[in-house]
């Protein structure tokens, strides 16, 4: 099942739900740019300014964090547990 981001319903981004709320992916244009798997948020790339806005809306809606933290996680090669707030290396 695919959903639009609540904050950006007209954007060229969608969230593909793979196993309920435990496993989903953010697809910006044609590229998977972030995912939550078993509660762990992974950011795969920051790409364009528009894609960064998509990532910001996704992490706010699904991980309850802001874009700046998501960017830091990506730059530091870390993943984030959306339930506990734990940060771990990828």
Feature map (PLM): residue ranges:
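Terminal leader/tail segments of proteins
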Residues: 1-90
């Amino acid at each position: 099942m695919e959903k639009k981001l609540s904050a950006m319903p007209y954007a060229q981004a969608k969230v593909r739900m793979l196993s309920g709320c435990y496993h989903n992916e953010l697809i910006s244009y044609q590229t998977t740019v972030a995912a939550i798997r078993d509660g762990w948020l992974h950011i795969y790339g920051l790409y364009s300014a528009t894609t960064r806005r998509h990532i910001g809306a996704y992490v706010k809606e699904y991980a309850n964090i802001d874009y700046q933290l998501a960017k830091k996680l990506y730059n530091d090669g870390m993943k984030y547990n959306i339930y506990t707030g734990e940060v771990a290396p990828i």
